[in-house]
């Protein structure tokens, strides 16, 4: 896989980025882990996630972060092989500190 620079960060990422929005529902954790491992094994090192990604069952006040938890569990022993792009894009609870 040919890697490309990510802006001026010095990071090199694959031209393909694996999105994780559906991790949780409809993609259960065991399948999501298999997908992540297959991507890493094939040279995809760029993973996109967010604090609100948990599949299609998201609702206001739900804790969110399911996809981030799955990604973390799946790559904990391969952390040096992955560039994780995450973002905070919406409240995950009703309170100002949520």
Label each residue range with its predicted role.
Residues 1-83:
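N-terminal binding-site loop/beta-alpha segment at the start of enzyme catalytic domains
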Residues 53-58, 91-97:
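A short acidic, helix-capping loop that chelates divalent metal ions and anchors anionic groups
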Residues 81-92:
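A short, structured active-site edge motif that brings together acidic residues
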């Amino acid at each position: 896989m040919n890697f490309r620079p990510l802006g001026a960060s010095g990071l090199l990422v694959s031209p393909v980025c694996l999105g994780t929005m559906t991790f949780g529902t409809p993609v259960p954790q065991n399948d999501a882990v298999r997908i992540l491992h297959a991507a890493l094994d094939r040279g995809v090192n760029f993973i996109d996630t967010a604090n609100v990604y948990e599949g299609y069952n998201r609702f206001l006040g739900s804790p969110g972060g399911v996809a981030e938890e799955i990604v973390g569990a799946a790559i904990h022993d391969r952390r040096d092989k992955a560039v994780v792009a995450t973002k905070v894009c919406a409240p995950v609870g009703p309170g100002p500190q949520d």
